[in-house]
A protein has these predicted regions:
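Extreme N-terminal cap/leader segments of soluble proteins
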Residues: 1-60, 76, 85, 107, ...
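Alpha-helical scaffold segments in soluble metabolic enzymes
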Residues: 7-11, 68, 72, 103
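Glycine-rich anion/phosphate-binding loops
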Residues: 21-23, 53-68, 92-102
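Short Gly/Ser/Thr- and Asp/Glu-enriched loop/turn motifs at secondary-structure junctions
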Residues: 25-27, 69, 80, 126
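Glycine-rich anion-binding loops of enzyme active sites
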Residues: 33-39, 46, 79-134
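A short, N-terminal amphipathic alpha-helix
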Residues: 65-76, 108
């Protein structure tokens, strides 16, 4: 998604980047300010055909992808600070990305866990979403 990656990020995910550490999602990395407390980090991937079915609604997939990570943080007694998102997509389709991004943004706001960075790539394989939360 080399040339279209910037457009995809600008349209669907930059509006979700509400934390200053996201730096407007112009890079794959985020800047975090440490408070001196321990930082709990977790990562989970969800893969089409393994963790969800090809016809599952994109909003449901988005919520699952984020919530499995938030559950891991909660299990450690951690308060979420943000997450980075990796999407491996066969195609960048509006009909799929719009509800995915909307649901991801709703959950990110509800759990005070903003997107801070990430990556998008194209793949001939199944859809894969990976989130690293902290």
């Amino acid at each position: 998604m080399a040339s279209g990656e910037d457009d995809l990020i600008a349209r669907y995910f930059r509006p979700l980047a509400t934390d200053p550490g996201a730096l407007g999602l112009v890079d794959d990395a985020a800047v975090l300010t440490s408070s001196g407390d321990d930082l709990v980090v977790t990562t989970d991937a969800v893969v089409e055909g393994v963790h969800f079915l090809p016809g599952d609604p994109p909003d449901t997939i988005a919520r699952k992808a984020l919530r499995v990570n938030l559950s891991d943080l909660a299990a450690k007694g951690a308060v979420p600070a943000g997450f980075v998102l990796t999407l491996a997509l066969r195609e960048a389709k509006e009909a799929w990305l719009a509800p995915f991004a909307r649901a991801l943004g709703e959950d990110a706001a509800a759990f005070n866990c903003p997107v801070l960075g990430g990556d998008t790539v194209s793949t001939p394989g199944p859809l894969m979403i990976s989130i690293t939360a902290f």
